Swiss-Prot record, chain A:
Keywords: Nucleus. It comes from Arabidopsis thaliana (Mouse-ear cress). GO terms for cellular component: nucleolus; nucleoplasm; nucleus. One of its GO terms (biological process) is floral meristem determinacy. This is Protein REBELOTE. A motif (Nuclear localization signal 3) lies at residues 512-519. The lineage of its organism: Eukaryota, Viridiplantae, Streptophyta, Embryophyta, Tracheophyta. Residues 1-13 have a biased composition (Basic residues). Disruption phenotype: Plants lacking both CRC and RBL exhibit strong floral meristem (FM) indeterminacy with reiterations of extra floral whorls in the center of the flower associated with reduced AGAMOUS and SUPERMAN levels. Residues 1-21, 35-58 are annotated as: Disordered. 'Rebelote' means once again in French. It holds the Pfam family Noc2. Expressed at low levels in roots, shoots, leaves, stems, inflorescences, flowers and siliques, with highest levels dividing tissues. A motif (Nuclear localization signal 1) lies at residues 8-15. Interacts with SWA2, NOC2 and NOC3 in both the nucleolus and nucleoplasm. Binds to ENAP1 and OBE1.
Curated annotation (Swiss-Prot), chain B:
It comes from Arabidopsis thaliana (Mouse-ear cress). A motif (Nuclear localization signal 2) lies at residues 441-448. Disruption phenotype: Female gametophyte mutant with impaired progression of the mitotic cycles and lost synchrony of female gametophyte development leading to an arrest of female gametophytes at the two-, four-, or eight-nucleate stage and characterized by unfused polar nuclei. Defective pollen development. InterPro entries: ARM-type_fold, CCAAT-binding_factor, CEBPZ/Mak21-like. Its main location: nucleus. The gene is SWA2. Keywords: Nucleus. Residues 32-113, 444-469, 632-737, 861-1043 are annotated as: Disordered. Interacts with RBL in both the nucleolus and nucleoplasm. Binds to NOC2. This is Protein SLOW WALKER 2.
Amino acid sequence: MGKLGKKARKFAKKNLQSVEKRSRKLKPFIKKKFAKRNERHQAGDKQEKKVEQQPKKRCQEEEFQDIAIDAVFGKDDDEVLRDGDSDSDGYLDELVNETDSDIMKCKVLSRSFLATCCDMVDKEQYVPALVRLLNWYRAACQYGHEPSGIARPNIYYDIEDSETFAKVIIFVLQKADHTFRSILGLSDSSTKEKILKLKNNPKWDSLKPLVKSFFRSTLHLVKQAGDLEIISFTLTQLRVSIVFLAAFPDLLKKLIKISVHLWVTGEETISQQAFLILKDISMVFNSECFDSCLINMYKAFLHDCDIPKANSEQRPFLRDSLVELCSQDVQKSYTKASVSITQLAKLLKMALATKNKEAVEKIHSGEYINCVDLWVNFISANVQDCDLQPLLYTIVQVINGVAQLIIGPRYLLLRVKCIHWLNHLSRTSGIFIPIASLVLDMLEYKTTNDGEKQEQKLEAVSTVKLPKNWLKSQNFQEQCIFSVIELLAVHFAQWSFHISFPDLATIPVMRLKKFHERSTMEGLKRVVKRFIEQVESNIEFVQRKRDDVTFSPNDQQSADTFMQLEKQNANAPYTQYYQSIIDKALGTNKKKKK
Amino acid sequence: MSKIKPLSKSSQDLSLLTSDIASFASSIGLASALPSSGFNDTDFRKPAKSKTQKRKKPKKDQQHKDEDEEGEPKSNIGNEKGKDFGARKQNKDAPVKQTLQPKPKPGFLSIDDESTGYKKKRFDEFKSLPKLPLVKASLLSSEWYNDAAEFEEKVFGGRKVAVANKEDFKGVVEKKRELGERLMWQYAEDFATSKGKGGDMKMVISAQKSGTVADKITAFEIMVGENPIANMRSLDALLGMVTSKVGKRFAFKGLKALSEILIRLLPDRKLKSLLQRPLNIIPENKDGYSLLLFWYWEDCLKQRYERFVTALDESSKDMLPELKDKALKTIYFMLTSKSEQERKLLVSLVNKLGDPQNKSASNADYHLTNLLADHPNMKAVVIDEVDSFLFRPHLGLRAKYHAVNFLSQIRLSHKGEDPKVAKRLIDVYFALFKVLTTEANRKQGADDKGAADKKKSNPKDTKQEVSTDSPIELDSRILSALLTGVNRAFPYVSTDEADDIIESQTPVLFKLVHSANFNVGVQSLMLLDKISSKNKIVSDRFYRALYSKLLLPSAMNSSKAEMFIGLLLRAMKNDINIKRVAAFSKRVLQVALQQPPQYACGCLFLLSEVLKSRPPLWKMVVQRESVEEEEDIEHFEDVIEGDDVDPNKKAENDENVVEVDHDGVEKSSRDGDSSSDDEEALAIRLSDEEDDNASDDSEELIRNETPQLEEVMEVSNDMEKRSQPPMRPSSLPGGYDPRHREPSYCNADRASWWELGVLSKHAHPSVATMAGTLLSGTNIVYNGNPLNDLSLTAFLDKFMEKKPKQNTWHGGSQIEPSKKLDMSNRVIGAEILSLAEGDVAPEDLVFHKFYVNKMTSTKQSKKKKKKKLPEEEAAEELYDVNDGDGGENYDSDVEFEAGDESDNEEIENMLDDVDDNAVEEEGGEYDYDDLDGVAGEDDEELVADVSDAEMDTDMDMDLIDDEDDNNVDDDGTGDGGDDDSDGDDGRSKKKKKEKRKRKSPFASLEEYKHLIDQDEKEDSKTKRKATSEPTKKKKKKKSKASE
């Protein structure tokens, strides 16, 4: 807007709100750049003030990696630290301009001093020592990230060697919570309410900055640390003191963000730890926190789905943990799920209506599929305990729609996935979902046998759509048949003792037989043949039992109790057979993953 | 006003004209000056008193004169002859050819100037001749033919005058033609002198000579409008524009102008040429001359019109599609409005069915349909024409398809000629079918492997080796169209003729049943059913075929699902063999287990309807599996004795025996695996045996097409009775064999409907409810079409709270004017709250709950915001606690949602972001109109899949409708007109009976009153009414119900 005249600017201000908004957004960035540069070149309080001002604006769109966010908290830090500084000893006078870590000219924190401090804090809960310790802790946490000594010229904390460094961190992390509690006279299991009641406690007033400083430093450490073990350890220790965060909603928010980020992007253990924190947060605090956890995680999860990653095996963990979180408060998650499923349905509807490429692509995106996957798992995890019937119904409809959106061998994997979901839902909820026709349609895929055997495994493909040339491969056909058998086996296994199993299986068996006749591949024929035999023996078995029954179909209760006994012992040959197929499929899946 | 200057110029020749005739002529002049038409009684009524008084006298005079003339035609002729000779002498040197070709010089866009060529000479000649007494040019009324009729009346007094048919008559005609030409010239001159002097006319004339094309055309139009007889040259000029080969843009403009002019000029009768006139008795007086003038004019007009039609025909074959369309439209226009040249017009219109462009072809189809709507009497003629078109050699399939499509859309009734028409149609269909099949044969003979793309589906050919090859798209479409046509026409054929058709065509139909294309199969089954229900001979073969069709996976995926269910219902209801019905029911249930929910619902509903008419079937639901023998069961399973495996059931005895028997079967079939050849042989042998039984020549085909080979094997083994020690007890204990090919031998009547148990646990609430209803022993009551109402798209629509756009149904057949109305009936969004929870359809319950939650939550949140007293909070907390354990309590959701409003928004926002605003776009993307447009285009594209489906569904709906009609007829009501009301009554009664009635979410009848009224109007026209959608929708259900 710089080049506009005065009138034009006036006009723009009045009428072009969006422009105004954007410029507002841009400004801090520009300033921030300057600020950072200035920071480096000229130290001083003046500069500091400037840095302090900007963050207020920036608060609106804080981002994880943004250093400016630190500045926000940095300001508060100073206050806290200054309080503590008054108590500190004369080390403050020492100023060292060189920050080379190896030389460590300024031995501000010696090992011995640290030891005494620790001792004092540990045994006597001596507050000044704690303050000093926290200052060192802060310095350690900020280590390497803050142009040490320059930002605060009058105070400078440095650490003697790496051992001390480690000790500070470890000690504070381990003992801080306990110390705080003992100072405040709280038990280890005090609840959030108690923390909030502390407001009236005079001790709290003095301790509050310390606690705050502790959290701030810890958060910084978590965010900046490169070493996985440190992060992991920090997270573990942080969990204990989460209750204190009730007093610092801002920090709580920050923690949630950081944890979500770690949860999504981190390694296995870190991710787990981060999740535990999130879970604790959502358990301890009010529903608002739960919501923000859930939303943030959900967002991050879906966002993550779009990024092609090498380690896709983490996704199930993410999904499962998210499901676990959702399951904590089913009713709340229920509304979220229904909103989300509505979105899914909207997309599906669009794809069905237009059938255009983009819409269909959207359906096939990892995001969509993972979202469905998430809710399927959520529903199946909770359907036994809660009434999720509407959700179940809608998601089944959506999945059916997705499965039938585009029929063709190229979308085999998606279809298989859909049927997996349906099977999963059906198994957990005990309702009947017809999948046979979906499965059996896969038998009709016209594939030729002339293609040479392909080396690649189908699962190596991350995309939903298969490359065309694969369709002709023998491998593909095998995969088709195996999927069919597997899916049907799961389906039949669920209903194998139901009184209407013979009728349920009749038509699929007929179609399989037809396929068996038609097929020319001996290997496949054998598999199919065996499957047919097993199912038929199952049919016979149920049929035989059914002939003995004395009740009629409209006697639902009796029908439900039918063959319950037999169901308990899984010794029936076909049950074992089904199980073997399912296991085999699982095994191959695992193998492929490795 | 009637100051005709009568005799001034014609004094010499017509001395015999007396003053009374002059006065009479003046009175006629008065009459002719009247704008109103004709020589009818209006003339006597309309004029003012003074005139009528004046007229009365002339009337008498006229009568006198008539008497006079009656007395003296002969002498007149004699006189005339003399005169004629005289006249001929006068015009001796004028070449005869000239008169035959009234327009020798196709002056393009110009009136042939009198100053050129020999015409000028002629006119000069005419000039030199004395003027004949003639009617004044200015006295022409707006419709010349009325004037002509008046003159005729005047001259011949209304008598019918036989046209002389002698050889020498031609000579007379020639002479008269010349005379007519002269008269016309004179008339034109008269016009030019009297009227042409006006300023307007001058301007017009100058525009004619020097103006833009548009000006000229307008000028010509004005001239012709002013007085066509005098300005024939203008007409010629216009014609020249159209016929000219040079400029197409003239043709564009000319066509319109000309067609408008000609519509005005042509009388409602056919034009007569001079040859058809009694020229020899025309008197040589003023009236006579005037009449001759008119006759001559008519002759000229006829010739010109013929040229115009030829030109139309030509331009309809033009390269330019626009011109083609325009010509086509004009052809239709002329054809509907005037009878002149109708043959030619019709031929060229029908010919357009073969246009290489689909659009034009379907336009022709459309116009023809409209034509028949306007002139139902033309059916026979049109059908004949299409017939001859269809059997032209080298006619493309596409053209045939269009033709058949048109034929199948013809509305028929039981009245009048229509039975004959229907018969004719059916003959055409079958003849065409024969041609198609023979063509296919020939092609296959020509090249064995190829011709796949053009191959007609001929079951005979495809039977053995290529049975798996699906017939090519185009092909199945034409077959399907053919069958639709037959299905439609057949009910209207009179009974005795129908028998012949059945006799001759049933084998063909059975062949078609086994066509690889499901739709074709269903339609032929449909027809077979129709035939057999008419004759009360329901063949086993039919049922067997139908039974096997159920197994096909495409049964429910095709566009004909609705039709198929209707067919099943009818077949099952009409079947007297209860065992067969049971077998069908079992299989339908099994199919329901496999299919998507809407079809499952359809199946369940079907069964419910069957149960209504076959109450004994209830025992399959409410009783335990029947073990006691019934007397009519075949006894082959009773023969063998067996050791009691399950001794606890006394009635089990014979079943166990059979189990033993079946063990053998199992065993043997297992053996068979190793030696499949053996099995194969057995199977074939068995199928032969069965063929003997059923005398079914296409048995083998069935075997190939349906996955029943295994079953065949088993049966064969059964027959072998290879008894072996019972390895393990087998299934199918003497009873139900789901895989038997012949439904009546399945023993399905002993099996209970266990499938309902699973279905009652169906994921879809509607299916579950329906199954539950059946299990509880009551009939399902449902006013809708489950196939549509429960489809995924319907669900999504409801989910999105979107009222689907009302798309205008364009095109379509008249038989099926609209079928998409039903969408508006849905209860969408929060409206659903207006219903009590009990009244909500099961599939909508989700939404109901959702909105209940939403409503209460918003209320609560508001409340909360208003006042948040501590007690209230406490109460809420309490509430919360209560909710904790009750999952069913939806208020808990409410509580949660109350706090979550903002979060919902947040999630939504977030999701929107994630989805790249895809959702936001949806408003713009759902342009149904656009989609429809696309679909419409596809419709015309013979190859397009989509249109196939669309078209098919149209026909389905219609067919079902038809069936309904027919059935009512068959039931003996006979009177088609009452169908609707009967249906309604029945329906309302049924409604009252409803137990679990849902309060109709549909709009009340009043809202559709206009539509119904429309229907009634249509009813009066034709018996087959096109019911409007709301009634229709119910009706469809009804059709299932009532059949």
